Design a protein with these regions (language model features):
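Internal signal-anchor transmembrane helix that establishes type II topology
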Residues: 45-75
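Intrinsically disordered, low-complexity cytosolic tails and juxtamembrane linkers
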Residues: 36-48
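Alpha-helical, hydrophobic structural elements that either
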Residues: 3-24, 28-39, 66-444
Length: 444
C-alpha cells in the first residue's frame, strides 16, 4: 500500500467516524431556528421581498444527511488537508454531488483569515462560489454558548453595503474539541446579483450586554468559475392535479442547477412547493433539491451536474404542497379566538405577549414533518397597520390529541394588538398526491 493510499484510508476512517457521530447525535429545536434566523435576516435586507421555501426537515437534513459509505478522491483528500479539522463540514457537503465535483475541479478558494480578540476567534477557511451560489466555510473558537448560535451574520460587499442575498446557516457542527465549532454559510445570488469583488463576513453577538463583533474581509477570486454557465431551454408545461406549471429553462453552474418555472396565475391553488422533487439521469442517479425562491415565477435549486452532464434527465415528483387560493386569507378575533375564512380545521388555541411581540398559538391537523409549516406573510390590524410574522415554531399534540400540531407564530411588535386582525397564509402543511414526470432535453 502506498503512502498516498494510506493517507486516503486514514482520512476515510476519520470521515466515517464523524458520520457515526452525526447519526447518533440529537437534533435540537434550535437547529431549525438557526436556519430560519438566517432566512429572516436576508428577507429584511432585500430591496424586494424574497420568500425562501424550505421544508421543515431541511435544518436537520443539513446535519444528518449521511447515508452509505463515504468515499474520497485525491482532490477531496487535498481539500481536507487544506482545511485542518474540517471533517465535520466535509461530511456535510459530501452529500452534495455538485459541490464535491467542484472541489474535484479545484474550485475551492482558500482564505484562512482570522479575527481574534478576548480569547475568541472566527476564521473563514475557504469558499466555493460561482454566479449563482457561494458556500463559506468557517470555524468558531471560544465563542460563548455556540450551540445556541446567539449571533447575527452580515455579509458585506467591498463598499461595506449589505449583499442583497438570501443565506442559511446550519446548527454548529460538533467537534472533538468542545471549544471549536465548524459550520458553513450557504448563499443564494438572485435578481441579477453576483459575488462581490471583496467580501466581509461579520458575526455580531445578540447579547444586549455585549458589543462583541468579529469581521473578516478578503478578496473573492471570481476567475475560478468565470464563464462556467450553461443554459438548457425546456419550454414545456406540466399539469399536476389541475395546476399548470410552465418549465422554462435549466441553468447549470458548478455549484448548482437552477430550474426556472412559472405557476399559472389562473391556478385555483397556491402551490408552496413540489413534493419529492428530483432530477434523475439515465443511470438512475437522483439530483435532489429542498430549496426554491420566488412566488409564481420560481427558481428551484438542485445539485449540480456541471462536470458530469447526463445523456438523459427526467424531472420527477409525487405531487405538491398547496392550498386553495380562497383559503389563504383569514380574519382572527384575538379575544374570542374565532377564525373566519382560512383552511378547514385551523384553530386558534391561545396567545401571549413576550416583550414587544405577540405569540399566537394555532392548532393544525396533521404533522409538520416532511412538509411545510403554517406560516404567515403579515398581520393587519383594524387601522390598516401591518406587522411582520418572521417565524414560527411548533410542537406535536393538541392536549392529548397527537393528530394535531401546535404552531406558534410570532407577530413582531404586536404586543398591543387587540380585537380582530387579518392574516395571509404563506405556507401550510396541506399535501396533494399527484405523481408527475417531465423529460428535460439535455442536448436540445
Amino acid at each position: 500500500m502506498t503512502d498516498e493510499q494510506k493517507s486516503f484510508d486514514t482520512l476515510e476512517e476519520r470521515l466515517n467516524a464523524r458520520k457515526t457521530e452525526y447519526e447518533t447525535m440529537p437534533v435540537p429545536d434550535a437547529a431549525y431556528q438557526a436556519v430560519q434566523s438566517g432566512i429572516r435576516q436576508a428577507a429584511r435586507k432585500r430591496k424586494s421581498r424574497l420568500r425562501w421555501y424550505m421544508s421543515s426537515i431541511s435544518a436537520a437534513a443539513l446535519i444528518l444527511l449521511f447515508t452509505g459509505c463515504i468515499r474520497v478522491s485525491p482532490a477531496f483528500a487535498s481539500f481536507v488537508e487544506q482545511l485542518p479539522g474540517m471533517e465535520g463540514i466535509v461530511s456535510m457537503i459530501r452529500q452534495d454531488k455538485g459541490l464535491m465535483m467542484a472541489i474535484d475541479q479545484s474550485l475551492l478558494q482558500k482564505v484562512g483569515v482570522t479575527d481574534e480578540h478576548d480569547g475568541t476567534s472566527l476564521t473563514v477557511d475557504g469558499i466555493i462560489t460561482d454566479e449563482s451560489r457561494m458556500v463559506i466555510f468557517y470555524t468558531m473558537k471560544g465563542m460563548k454558548d455556540p450551540e445556541k448560535f446567539n449571533y447575527d451574520i452580515d455579509l458585506l460587499d467591498e463598499n461595506g453595503k449589505d449583499l442583497p442575498v438570501a443565506f442559511t446557516h446550519a446548527y454548529p457542527t460538533p467537534s472533538p474539541d468542545e471549544n471549536v465549532n465548524e459550520n458553513m454559510i450557504d448563499v443564494i445570488f438572485t435578481d441579477g446579483t453576483s459575488p462581490p469583488e471583496e467580501l466581509s463576513v461579520v458575526f455580531k453577538s445578540r447579547d444586549t450586554t455585549s458589543a462583541e463583533k468579529w469581521k473578516i474581509t478578503f478578496p473573492v477570486d471570481k476567475n475560478l468559475t468565470k464563464g462556467m454557465k450553461k443554459v438548457i431551454p425546456v419550454n414545456q408545461t406540466l399539469t399536476v392535479d389541475g395546476q399548470r406549471i410552465d418549465v422554462k429553462q435549466a441553468t447549470l453552474y458548478p455549484t448548482r442547477l437552477v430550474l426556472d418555472v412559472n405557476f399559472d396565475p389562473k391556478n385555483t391553488k397556491k402551490v408552496f412547493g413540489l413534493s419529492d422533487l428530483q432530477l434523475v439521469d439515465e443511470q438512475g442517479r437522483a439530483w435532489r433539491t429542498d430549496t426554491s425562491t420566488g412566488e409564481d415565477e420560481r427558481s428551484i435549486y438542485f445539485e449540480s451536474m456541471y462536470f458530469s452532464i447526463p445523456k438523459k434527465l427526467t424531472l420527477q415528483g409525487s405531487g405538491f404542497s398547496g392550498l386553495d387560493k380562497e383559503d389563504l386569507a383569514l380574519s382572527l378575533d384575538l379575544k374570542s379566538h374565532q377564525i373566519t375564512g382560512g383552511p378547514p380545521g385551523l384553530k386558534m388555541v391561545g396567545s401571549k405577549v413576550e416583550g414587544k411581540d405577540l405569540i399566537i398559538d394555532f392548532s393544525v391537523a396533521g404533522s409538520m414533518d416532511g412538509g411545510f409549516v403554517l406560516s404567515f406573510g403579515n398581520v393587519t390590524d383594524s387601522a390598516g397597520k401591518s406587522y411582520e410574522v418572521p417565524g414560527s415554531s411548533w410542537s406535536s399534540g393538541d392536549g392529548t390529541d397527537d393528530s394535531h400540531t401546535i404552531v406558534s407564530s410570532t407577530v413582531e411588535n404586536g404586543a398591543k394588538l387587540k380585537g380582530e386582525v387579518k392574516m395571509n397564509i404563506s405556507t401550510y402543511p396541506m399535501k396533494v398526491k399527484s405523481p408527475f414526470s417531465l423529460d428535460i432535453p439535455v442536448n436540445p
